A protein has these predicted regions:
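N-terminal signal peptide c-region/cleavage motif recognized by signal peptidases
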Residues: 16-18
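Short, compact, well-ordered microdomains
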Residues: 115-117, 122-128
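Central antiparallel beta-sheet cores of small beta-barrel/beta-sandwich binding domains
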Residues: 34-116
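Boundary of Sec targeting at the N-terminus
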Residues: 21-24
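Edge beta-strand at a domain terminus
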Residues: 124-126, 132-148
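Short aromatic-glycine motifs in intrinsically disordered, low-complexity regions
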Residues: 75-81, 128-135
């Protein structure tokens, strides 16, 4: 008879501790994985200010023979010819239910800015980032992996 209350208590504690371990915010350092090659491309730090998320490139993973900090030659406006490391590539994202949307993402490879939405997966260990034109169906997604 006493086993039942102990089992219920143990199950309750297990659920509570597993919920504590889940991360519901994308704030932190993320490894951007190239969707074509599957190799790491960059480290991006996502921060929050006044309820909006932004992401800045902290490091590029480049071959030794490549320029280690190339400039964004295809970017327009203020980002034109700025070093890619240090560039804000994600901005204006706001919480939208369990997802994040309403912001933009810059692709330094082509200099284009896209609408963006994001969602956390695998208890906050992965971030699904989608950049698109017009509607989300017309875009591409990448999965970023949490570094810290």
């Amino acid at each position: 008879m006493k086993k039942r209350p102990i089992s219920i208590l143990a199950a309750g504690l297990l659920i509570a501790f597993s919920a504590i371990g889940q991360t519901s915010s994308p704030v932190g350092l993320w490894k951007n994985i190239d969707d074509a090659t599957g190799k790491p491309k960059a480290l991006i730090r996502i921060t929050e200010s006044n309820g909006e998320l932004s992401g800045k490139i902290e490091k590029l993973f480049r071959e030794p023979s490549e320029e280690q900090n190339p400039k964004c030659v295809k970017c327009e406006g203020d980002n034109k010819d700025k070093p890619i490391v240090g560039l804000t590539m994600l901005q204006g994202m706001k919480k939208d239910g369990t997802d994040f949307s309403g912001g933009t993402i810059l692709d330094p490879a082509n200099g284009k800015v896209y609408k963006s939405k994001m969602s956390l997966e695998e208890d906050g260990k992965k971030l699904n980032v989608r950049g698109y034109i017009g509607v989300p169906m017309l875009g591409r997604s990448q999965t970023w992996v949490r570094e810290e």
